[in-house]
Amino acid sequence: MKLILITPPTYFVEEDKIITALFEEGLDILHLRKPNTAPMFAERLLSLIPEQYHKRIVVHGHFYLKEEYFLKGIHLNSRNPNIPENYKGHISCSCHSLEEVKEHKRNCDYVFLSPVFDCISKKDYHANYSPEEIRKAHKAGIIDKKVIALGGIDTNNIQQVKDYGFGGAAILGALWNRFDTCNDCDY
């Protein structure tokens, strides 16, 4: 089962050190998601992360960074829904319904399905699927190894994610809420 970490939406002091330590401890993939931020901040963060880990980083915006920093790939979402012209490489995308999963899974290396549980980072963002719906979707082949669970995943329910048949779990609030990320850093 893949373990994917999504960055918090803002930059913070020593974020690169935490990310590097997590890679050293076995983090599979990092999704660099910093909506509404200037690309120079992403460039700065990437320059501080050892190059050996760049091939395990996926960007949610500023797609040119994929080639410039030899990153793993790009992630499509509502802000950046289109594959760049002539793009070749890893693609993932966000899905918020089982119908979207069916639609996008065939064109992506994997897709996120959210929210699977009540979100930790977005307090009013509740689970969109019952356990029965998830099991039914797995049995129907909708949820499989190409579908990554997102939303409210922590140490208390990560085993459920595996048992449901997801290909992995994407973590956000369960990890980043343990750090003081509220201090924006002007790189």
Language-model region placement:
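Conserved N-terminal beta1-alpha1 strand-loop-helix module at the mouth
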Residues: 1-110, 136-139, 143-145, 154-168, ...
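A short acidic, helix-capping loop that chelates divalent metal ions and anchors anionic groups
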Residues: 117-124
